[in-house]
Structures are given as structure tokens and as C-alpha cells.
Amino acid sequence: QNVDAQDESFDAVYSIEATCCAPDKPSIYGEVFRLLKPGARFGVYEYCMTDRFDAGDPHHLRIKADLQLGGGLLVIDDRQTIDHALRSVGFEVLETRDLAAQTGPSIPWYQPLVGSGISLASFRSSRIGRWVTNNTLRALEALRIAPQGMVAVSETLNLCAAAMVEAGRLGIFTPMYFIHARKPAE
């Protein structure tokens, strides 16, 4: 979070699904603010829980916990918390929207994780494909060809993928919360 660069040395900064890994949003956004020249822009794709997320629903909470565990995330904020963090360090928030919620003839963002259709890529994401992968890794671990722990990593990633699919279907999570912000001109 501490970039070795002079203050006000960037004309623009963007982040695509990267700042979601920062446990302290104001700190990371503050560092971006420090680096930007006055009037410069910041574009962000952020993970966040949507307005449909119900913190009182045990099913929603389990999905969120699986997303955090599988994604290695300490927190997944809601959009209001993210917007507040940007404003708290001085940004003007020019535009925000959940690009995953846009209507139109598109494939849902989580569809590649479902494993539907007939292709090598979809087989890999299918229930059978994940079973084959885990059992192949088990055999490779037993033969000491793959390092110990590969199955555990695979299972954690599969847990996250399943949680992303369920969260996407329910509309309680988006990996595509778009923010366009600006450092005020002096």
C-alpha cells in the first residue's frame, strides 16, 4: 500500500479487482489519492456485496464467508462503505454502477464458473471436471509429483467458485462495481 513514487506524480490510476484484497480501503484509496495529480482520475472495478445482500440471512452470510475464504479476502464491503471510503480521503465520486446488473443480451458474469455447455473450458468448471481435477491432484500428491497441499488449494478455489455462482444467481455480490472518481483540482 506504500508505493515508492512522488506525491502527485500520476495522471490517472486504475484498479481492476485488486483493491478488494486491501483490508483497509481508506488506506489504499488514500495512497492512490496521494499519487494522483490534482484533477486526475481514478477508475476502479471493486468486489462488493450488493443491496440484495441480507446480513441477517444465514445463507447469505455463508456465501459471503465462502467468498472471503476462497478469495483470500478479509472483508467484502458494500457499495456505500466503498463510496464513503473514497470520499473520506478526498475523492469526488463522479459515477458508480454495478456493471453486472446491467440488462442486455449478455452472459452473466458467473457463467464461466458454472461449467455448462460442451467444451474443454466448461468441462473444467463442471462438477465432474472439478472431481477429476481433485482426484488427479490427489494421485499426483500421493506420488510426490505435486507438492502436498494442492488438493486443499483446489478445494478452496472450488468453494469460492461455487460461492461466486450462488452469489451471482442471487444478485448479492458483484465483482464489477465500477467507480469513476477524481482528485479535486486545486
Annotate the PLM regions.
Residues V44-E46:
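Acidic carboxylate diad motif detector
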Residues A55-F173, R182-P184:
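Substrate-binding/catalytic lobe of Class I Rossmann-like enzymes that use SAM or dcSAM, i.e.
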